[in-house]
């Protein structure tokens, strides 16, 4: 239908990080015929990520942070992503997010369309997280208890 995303972006969780795994989401999206993009740390522009296409047969290797990423793949324009699954160590009901502190997701999400959702345990929802001017707000937090839409 017209409400189904045509292209999703999902992180590949860093082993031992406590991030919620995205494997089941990726497999279900692939089986539904939805295109999938995953992030790759850019080796040309420090502090930036780019997106590449992914399917279940895509070979992965750990990057310098230990995060699995494809060796290669079709470059995907971030402006084409309909739904972003963003990693979070914590989030507030305001839509503020705590990541790993390097700003990679804030940079790639800045100005990008698409619905931005974090996957995290309910216990990692916080009352308040201060926002910096460069921080990008989430549109939703998805926990084992349900979906939380931020208040503004």
Language model features: what each stretch is:
Residues 44-152:
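Conserved phosphate- and dinucleotide-binding cores of soluble alpha/beta proteins
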Residues 1-79:
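N-terminal active-site beta-alpha-beta segment that forms phosphate/nucleotide-binding
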């Amino acid at each position: 239908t017209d409400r189904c995303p045509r292209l999703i972006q999902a992180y590949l969780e860093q082993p031992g990080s406590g991030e919620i795994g995205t494997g089941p989401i990726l497999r279900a999206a692939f089986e539904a015929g939805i295109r999938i993009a995953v992030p790759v740390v850019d080796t040309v522009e420090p502090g930036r990520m780019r997106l590449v296409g992914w399917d279940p047969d895509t070979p992965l290797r750990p990057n310098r942070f230990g995060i699995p990423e494809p060796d290669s793949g079709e470059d995907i324009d971030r402006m084409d992503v309909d739904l972003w699954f963003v990693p979070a160590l914590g989030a507030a009901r305001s839509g503020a997010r705590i990541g790993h502190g390097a700003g990679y997701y804030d940079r790639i999400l800045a100005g990008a369309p698409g619905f931005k959702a974090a996957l995290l345990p309910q216990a990692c929802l916080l009352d308040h997280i201060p926002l910096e001017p460069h921080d990008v707000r989430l549109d939703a937090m998805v926990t084992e208890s349900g979906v939380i839409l931020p208040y503004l």
